[in-house]
Regions:
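Solvent-exposed, extramembrane regions of membrane proteins
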Residues: 2-523, 528-629
Length: 629
């Protein structure tokens, strides 16, 4: 699900070089740019022209499988199998060793949430290039690309498996040492790769640093985390500290939630602040699972990397447009600005300049929109889970009230990866829509003022606003006439509206007849507005996987929303605080009933042993050896 990939900068370089037929310089090669770029672009490329790093991140990814498999084998050997097979099975020779290692509990894990999230964040730049299909370890036909990406995902997933396995292992001392060593290897290799070639061909100075600093930060956190685990485990091993408690079946926040349900609701609710009412209210009786924390952390870092990659593409395209613009200026100068194509060329130059400016300006609002979506998705997850805990399913479409069990299990495996992909594609689509909107505003409002056509623009804008106002006013007048003349009075003074009972029927029929022809024309505008609003809302909410953008009755066609609902049902069935508390009571009662006879019979056996030993001692002391027969 959380797949990984290879070197960020190298992947961008390879993909961008496919966009042009001109010979360009690769990292560590002797080819140069032959196109005439701006001085800034040439300086940026010259920074990395002679860089030939000794670290090949793709090759290191392949070789990292060796220590990864060794760590997995060690942890698997330490992991005990709960159920051993029969003697006629060959696995019996292994004893109870080599159990299955679980990297992360994707359903009910609430501890080490941020450690798992940071571990996923350390793989963000790798995830990005599987998302962009920048990593293909094998060259196969086009129809087999899906299998190649699957193999690549398994390979890079296996290379980062020790991060999660060492965090979740029960053998804290061994796993912390192995995890620290493996994280240190990745950290040193990444730092070596950055220091050898810190600059790049697209962003110039410190381009490689911009790609790798999130992974370095996450690896640094993991180093500190594994070191802290090793120190704590060593103190316990030496007897300097108490043994850590076993992971509880019932989490504290789940128990607090059940206690809150059993309490009487307060007579008067506490007054909430503006932040709690409008933004977010913290709930001590609810915790997000590790899967949600890891998804959000990875989505944040992937969104940042996606924006950086997009900016690299923008720099590349902008330099190509600058070259094209220079050729257009040369043509205009050659014809002394009197040629038949001169006005068209000036308009094309203006279009290119406006497009570059609008695209650059809309990066920030598009990014902020997607960031707000990530926070909103967390809030919706908590809200939807609480509704399901209360037995309320009315917020879901009717077709999703009873999803299939197999579909829900698959959904929880799909959700995290799909959420990240939806955020990235949503950012790009929102950015395109905002850029088009910016182009419309620029051509409709800004350029007329620049070209001394402000009065004509205001005249046309005023006529348009007046036309729309009249149309909306006539629609409001129709509603007011219907309320005043064609409905019977309220039955009670406390009624909010009049009853749906017709009055003045003859006038009502004439009203409908004469407005019939007008409403045909009005319906054309309403239809176009419906299409426009649907397109805007659909593109604006494309990144929101927590709500469907399909019409009622077609919700099943939204696969992302189906994954969201299936994930909610799995979490609802496995982490419902009331259900978990009930199971906790059953398990505790069973343990108590199991231990009680053992304690009772053990006490009786101990008493019987003491009595018999006492009797034997008394018999030996009272009996005279000489009187024995």
């Amino acid at each position: 699900m959380f797949a990984l990939s290879v070197s960020s900068e190298a992947g961008i370089t390879r993909r961008l070089e496919k966009l042009t037929n001109n010979p360009e310089k690769c990292r560590g090669c002797g080819r140069r740019f032959s196109t005439g770029m701006t001085s800034t672009g040439e300086m940026a490329r010259q920074l990395n022209d002679t860089c030939a790093g000794s670290v090949d991140m793709e090759l290191f990814l392949h070789y990292s499988l060796i220590p990864s498999l060794c760590i997995i084998l060690v942890l698997s050997f330490l992991q005990r199998r709960e159920r051993c097979r029969q003697r006629d099975d060959t696995s019996y020779l292994l004893g109870d060793h080599f159990g299955i290692i679980v990297p992360l509990d994707f359903v009910g894990a609430f501890s080490n949430r941020w450690s798992y999230g940071i571990a996923f964040g350390a793989t963000a730049n790798k995830v990005m290039f599987l998302f962009l299909e920048g990593y293909q370890p094998l060259q196969v036909p086009q129809w087999a690309q899906a299998f190649v990406l699957l193999v690549g995902g398994f390979e890079v997933g296996l290379s980062h498996f020790p991060f999660f396995a060492c965090l979740s292992s029960e053998f804290r001392l061994v796993s912390s040492i192995l995890g620290f060593s493996y994280s240190l290897i990745w950290f040193v290799v990444t730092v070596l790769h950055i220091t050898q070639c810190p600059h790049g061909r697209f962003l110039g100075r410190f381009e490689t640093v911009m790609f790798y600093w999130p992974s370095l930060l996450c690896l640094s956190f993991l180093l500190g985390r594994f070191l802290h685990m090793a120190v704590k485990s060593l103190r316990v091993h030496l007897g300097w500290a108490l043994q850590m408690k076993e992971k509880p079946f019932l989490e504290i926040h789940q128990a607090e939630h059940v206690k809150q349900l059993l309490r009487k609701p307060p007579l008067q609710e506490e007054q909430k602040s503006w932040f709690q009412t409008r933004v977010y209210e913290w709930d001590p009786c609810f915790q997000f699972p590790s899967r949600m924390i890891g998804t959000v952390v990875l989505a944040f870092i992937c969104l940042y990397l996606f924006i950086v990659i997009e900016f690299c593409m923008f720099v590349y395209v902008r330099e190509k447009l600058d070259v094209f613009e220079g050729k257009l200026e040369s043509y205009i100068a050659s014809v002394n600005q009197t040629g038949p194509l001169a006005p068209v060329i000036l308009q094309v130059k203006e279009l290119m300049n406006i497009s570059k400016g609008v695209w650059l300006v809309t990066i920030l609002p598009a990014a902020l929109t997607c960031v707000s979506y990530l926070f909103h998705i967390l809030a919706c997850y908590r809200k939807h889970m609480k509704r399901l805990w209360a037995g309320n399913k009315h917020f879901l479409p009717v077709k999703f009230h009873s999803p299939s069990s197999s579909g829900s299990v698959v959904a929880i495996a799909r959700y995290s990866g799909w959420q990240i992909a939806y955020i990235l594609w949503g950012y790009f689509i929102i950015h395109v829509v905002q850029s088009l909107l910016g182009m419309v505003i620029t051509y409709g409002l800004v350029l007329p003022v620049i070209h001394d056509q402000g009065l004509e623009m205001l005249h046309g804008l005023g006529i348009g606003i007046l036309t729309v106002s009249i149309v909306l006013g006539l629609m409001i007048v129709q509603v007011q006439i219907a309320s005043s003349f064609f409905l019977q009075p309220r039955m009670a003074a406390a009624d909010k509206q009049k009853p749906l009972a017709l009055n003045n029927r003859r006038a009502f029929h004439n009203f409908n007849y004469f407005l019939f022809f007008y409403n045909v024309l009005l319906g054309l505008g309403a239809c176009l507005s419906r299409l426009l609003i649907s397109c805007i809302l659909g593109t604006w909410l494309i990144a929101r996987i927590d709500r469907t953008i399909m019409q009622r009755g077609y919700e099943r066609a939204d696969m992302g929303f189906g994954a969201w609902v299936g994930m909610l049902y799995v979490d609802h069935c496995h982490t419902n605080p009331v259900l978990v508390s009930f199971c906790h009571i059953l398990i505790a009662g069973h343990r108590e009933r199991t231990l009680r006879p053992v304690i009772k019979y053990g006490h009786l056996n101990q008493s019987a042993g003491v009595t018999s030993r006492t009797a034997n001692l008394e018999g030996c002391s009272c009996q005279d050896p000489g009187q024995s027969h």
